């Protein structure tokens, strides 16, 4: 059974007792080791499968592991091979009486939650403009994880009437939605993913008999992707392994990329400090990628300081494949040229017999895909976009383009989309009035609004200001550049302010990318540069019909690519403030960005391409090449375009200044409200509030009458 394993894998498989930590590099065969270890426990040691818990982080990975183990053991009983959430469903199905829930409780998915939200919104007269269902789901999750972590005591111990009263008495939108949701949950005995682990922990904490039963049952516990574990999962693991004390974990600290979701690399790094006599095994031989790709990835990740020092070791011979070559680095003069390069290289690969689905174009965030999508559509290269809408299908892009279209055409579709965005108190009742008027008298909905503006139905609305907005720009837009019109319109309409109020950085990034698309159109279109032609140009991209077949290039974020591998990988948008993201505000967050780049690099099997482009945008200023390119030794990169000494120096200066700012911000992380600080110019003061979202302090200085809101970058020190 273990003859085909390497020495490190054999050691991992046959080390069965105690606390064992496996540091497994990308492509090192950790799944193979896990499945063989399970089979070894069953076939060689004689352990019953039902006494083994093997945890993975996705249902897909669990199904794949279950299938492999079944082949190795020949036994249909594969025990508990599942995610943490699936395991908790098993616990709750068996012991739901401990939380006064029936065994037939529901596990809620997003569609179930949306249906509950629909009921709440209708009952309390809420609208999607106040909070979308997506934002409501996020808000509920944040309240359960951070703001009201003991919420489950209410759900378990309160009667249905008591929760209902909390819901009815709630005044704020988020409280109405949250307690309305808890009421709907209790009403149908439904539990979402956050509840499953919380309820299981509650049972184990409150009922010693049930806890001991599960502890004794699970003689061996194995956990995959341990670098992605969060605090509550860690607590569950501690409880479960506390009887037999057999815990086997596998992880790679260089692939911790989910700290924003609660994951913490400290659980893997400090494992030997938390448990006694830990045996650590290193599995570093990489069976996936070419030696050239491994050199690139190693060179990159070595720049991180908070890590276990290790290098991947390539196993595949350098001469094994004609496609093997140095990592390609292409510096473009524009985003369009970058997209053209990616498309051209993909076409060359496909002309040489490579199937499109063997190619992946990866990026840090979805907005980066816009210019690449355009070129792929022009060249009729089929692609599939994972985990996201095509650029021109995104809500904020459709809304913005509808404003432009409304200025040019005053059409009903655009009117219906934007008349109440941002909120102008022109809801369904008033829209129905306009539709009935048009049906009886003809004309457009906008005309109907103008003709009926004095009707009392439109009192207490902002209908008049909307009419003025459209009419004013309709008279002047032909004398304005499209980019100028777009910027003014976003500002005058209040649309951009609405997004900023919502705090949706990704949607603002997408608006910035649309601005960039308009600039590029203005530069390239010549005499035909007018609003009507631009809208037609965009419509072509919005309505392109790509052929449906399996031979499609994969477009996805690096987060979505985690756990996948492709022979050929392009990573686009390798610019400062794009990758690494401009949202990075600490040295530890920058190290996570570098780990994300490492994950991206190690998705490639045969050839890796890194691309970026020069340019300027309102969102980012001048675009410099990413530090994640400079982190790689020059000898490992095939420069398709040599960088000028001037650009190299400016880039390094920018990165150096960025690092200094991160160091300053890191030094301020331990500040709290009430702390006394000193400012280089304003003197001594006291912190009143800290806004971690806007990254500001509210400080009352001794020599100033009113408090000042200061950036995290302000020159202050703790006294």
Predicted regions and their residues:
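Conserved helicase NTPase motor core
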Residues: 3-14, 18-23, 33, 53, ...
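ATP-hydrolysis module of ASCE/P-loop NTPase motor domains
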Residues: 15-16, 21, 76-79, 97-195, ...
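P-loop NTPase Walker
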Residues: 1-103, 107, 114, 188, ...
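Helicase P-loop NTPase motor core
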Residues: 22, 28-34, 276-279, 284-382, ...
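Short glycine-/polar-rich loops that comprise or flank the Walker A/P-loop
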Residues: 18, 47-51, 77, 243-245, ...
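Short alpha-helix plus adjacent loop in nuclease-associated cores
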Residues: 87-95, 254-259, 288, 387-408
């Amino acid at each position: 059974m273990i003859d085909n394993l390497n020495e490190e894998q054999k050691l991992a498989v046959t080390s069965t007792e105690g606390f064992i930590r496996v540091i497994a590099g990308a492509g090192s065969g950790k799944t193979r080791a896990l499945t063989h270890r399970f089979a070894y426990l069953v076939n060689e040691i004689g352990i019953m499968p039902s006494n083994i818990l093997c945890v993975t982080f996705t249902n897909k990975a669990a199904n794949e592991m279950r299938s492999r183990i079944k082949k190795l053991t020949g036994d249909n009983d594969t025990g508990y091979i599942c995610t943490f959430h699936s395991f908790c469903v098993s616990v709750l199905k068996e012991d739901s009486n401990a939380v006064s829930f029936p065994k037939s409780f529901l596990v809620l998915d997003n569609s179930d939650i949306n249906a509950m939200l629909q009921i709440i919104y209708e009952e309390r007269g809420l609208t999607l403009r106040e909070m979308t269902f997506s934002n409501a789901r996020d808000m509920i999750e944040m309240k359960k994880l951070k703001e009201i972590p003991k919420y489950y005591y209410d759900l378990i111990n309160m009667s249905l009437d008591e929760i209902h009263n909390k819901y009815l008495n709630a005044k704020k939108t988020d409280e109405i939605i949250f307690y309305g949701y808890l009421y709907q949950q209790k009403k149908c005995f439904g539990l979402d993913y956050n509840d499953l682990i919380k309820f299981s922990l509650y049972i184990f904490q409150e009922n010693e008999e049930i806890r001991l039963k599960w502890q004794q049952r699970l003689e061996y516990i194995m956990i995959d992707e341990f670098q992605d574990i969060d605090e509550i999962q860690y607590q569950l693991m501690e409880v479960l392994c506390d009887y037999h004390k057999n815990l086997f974990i596998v992880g790679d600290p260089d692939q911790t990329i989910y700290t924003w979701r609660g994951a913490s690399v400290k659980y893997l790094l400090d494992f030997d400090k938390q448990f006694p006599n830990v045996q650590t095994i290193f599995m570093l031989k990489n069976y996936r990628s070419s030696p050239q790709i491994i050199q690139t990835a190693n060179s990159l990740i070595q720049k991180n300081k908070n890590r276990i020092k290790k290098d991947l070791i390539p196993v595949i011979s350098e001469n094994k494949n004609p496609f093997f070559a140095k990592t390609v680095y292409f510096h473009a003069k524009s985003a369009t040229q970058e997209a053209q390069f990616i498309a051209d290289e993909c076409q060359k690969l496909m002309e040489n017999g490579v199937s499109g689905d063997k190619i992946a174009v990866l990026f840090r965030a979805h907005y980066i895909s816009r210019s690449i999508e355009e070129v792929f559509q022009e060249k009729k290269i089929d692609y599939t976009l994972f985990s996201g809408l095509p650029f021109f299908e995104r809500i904020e892009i459709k809304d913005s383009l509808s404003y432009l279209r409304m200025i040019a055409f005053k059409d009903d579709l655009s009117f219906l989309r934007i008349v109440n965005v941002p909120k102008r108190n022109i809801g369904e009742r008033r829209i129905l009035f306009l539709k009935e008027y048009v049906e009886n008298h003809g004309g457009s909905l906008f005309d109907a609004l103008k003709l009926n503006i004095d009707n009392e139905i439109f009192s207490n609305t902002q209908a008049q200001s909307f009419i003025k907005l459209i009419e004013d720009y309709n008279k002047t837009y032909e004398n304005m550049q499209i980019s100028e019109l777009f910027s003014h319109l976003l500002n005058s309409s209040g649309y951009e302010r609405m997004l900023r109020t919502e705090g949706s950085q990704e949607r603002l990034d997408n608006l910035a990318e649309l601005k960039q698309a308009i600039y590029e159109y203005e530069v390239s279109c010549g005499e035909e540069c007018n609003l009507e032609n631009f809208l037609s140009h965009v419509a072509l991209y919005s309505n392109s019909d790509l052929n449906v077949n399996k031979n499609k290039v994969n477009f996805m974020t690096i987060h979505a690519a985690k756990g996948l591998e492709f022979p050929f990988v392009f990573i686009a948008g390798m610019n400062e403030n794009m990758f690494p993201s401009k949202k990075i505000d600490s040295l530890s967050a920058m190290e996570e960005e570098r780990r994300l780049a490492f994950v991206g690099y190690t998705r490639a099997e045969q050839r890796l391409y890194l691309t970026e482009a020069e340019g300027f945008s309102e969102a980012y200023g001048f675009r410099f090449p990413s530090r994640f390119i400079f982190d790689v030794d020059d000898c490992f990169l095939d420069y398709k375009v040599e960088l000028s000494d001037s650009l190299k120096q400016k880039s390094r200066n920018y990165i150096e200044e960025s690092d200094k700012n991160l160091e300053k911000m890191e030094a301020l992380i331990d500040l709290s409200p009430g702390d006394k600080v000193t400012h280089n110019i304003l003197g001594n003061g006291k912190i009143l509030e800290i806004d971690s979202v806007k990254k500001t302090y509210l400080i009352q200085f001794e020599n100033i009458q009113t408090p000042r809101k200061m950036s995290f970058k302000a020159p202050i020190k703790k006294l």
